[in-house]
Amino acid sequence: ASGGNNAERTLIVTSYAASAVDAAINDVVIPSDKNIAISIHYYAPWNFADGQTTSFTENDKIELSNKFSQLKSMFADKGTPVIIGEFGCVKAASDTLRGDYFEYYISEAKKFGIKCFVWDNGTLSGESSFGIFDRDAYKWTETLLKGIIDGAE
């Protein structure tokens, strides 16, 4: 079933619980292999991502930049690609601000060579509303989609 290509496939590893906290990423030991990548979940800044605040500040941007720089120096600069396997923010702030957040997050990660996957749990309302695509109406939340696309360009 693998087609005999396992020796050339990329193996994605994570820190403990895919955490981006220093204690978790400092303990990651990457084997000497060109086909390894690391995936981290990084919901940051946490107060915005979790909906405890509805502002996305310059200090929040600095926090993201610092973490991306750290991940680059710890892994990418040593030959291990970095993937943000999950990130996002709940629907506490306006969709316009959330779109701006997605654009900044993705474009800033891109500067450090980091690829990102936005988390969409299919929920468009309530405390854990990470949804960006309405699965009943088959419609995107346009401002969020625009932020994602603009950040990736």
Predicted features along the sequence, with ranges:
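Active-site region of glycoside hydrolase catalytic domains
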Residues: 1-53, 69-89, 111-112
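Residue-level detector of secondary-structure boundary/capping sites
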Residues: 6-7, 62, 96, 107
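N-terminal substrate-binding region of glycoside hydrolase catalytic domains
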Residues: 12, 56-59, 91-92, 137-140
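Acidic-and-aromatic substrate-binding clefts and catalytic sites of carbohydrate-active enzymes
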Residues: 16-22, 62, 90-99, 124-125
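Acidic/histidine-rich helix-loop elements
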Residues: 47-64, 135
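Short, acidic/polar
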Residues: 64-72, 101-106
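Aromatic-rich peripheral "rim/lid" segments of glycoside hydrolase catalytic domains that contact
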Residues: 94-153
